[in-house]
C-alpha cells in the first residue's frame, strides 16, 4: 500500500527540556502505520528549509526508509517549528513558526506523484483545500485530519466530498 504524508511537517521543540523531534500529524501517522503495516510504502511530500531542523526531518525520514524524493528544500528557508511546553503530562502548543510552509504548494511533479498513491494524509495546516479534487482524481484516497479545526470554513465542503476524515475534540 502506497501512503504519502502530504503537506505540513514541522519540528516540535521543547526548549526547557532541550529536546526536538520531527513531526506533523502526517509524519506521526505514517511512522505509526509503518510499525503496524509491514507492506506500507511510505513517502512524504512537503517543504523544509535548508536549516538544521530541515536536515533533522530528512534524516528521520531516511532512517525509516521513507521516500523523500518529493521534499522541497528551500534555500535560506526556515523549517516549520512548533515550540512546545508541558503542562503536567499534557503537551501545549506554545508558539508556531510555519516558515517555508506558509507559501508551500506542491509542484506539478509532486501532484503527479500524489495521484499515484493509494492513500494520503493531509490537513488544514497548509493551503490544501483547493488541491483535494486534483489529488484524488485518479483514485487516491484522502485521510483528512481536521484535528481540532471542526469550525474551519472548509469543513462542510470537505466532509461532503472525501472518504476518510478525523476530528480530535
Segments and roles (model prediction):
Residues 1-6, 60-73, 85-169:
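Ribokinase/PfkB-type carbohydrate-kinase core domain
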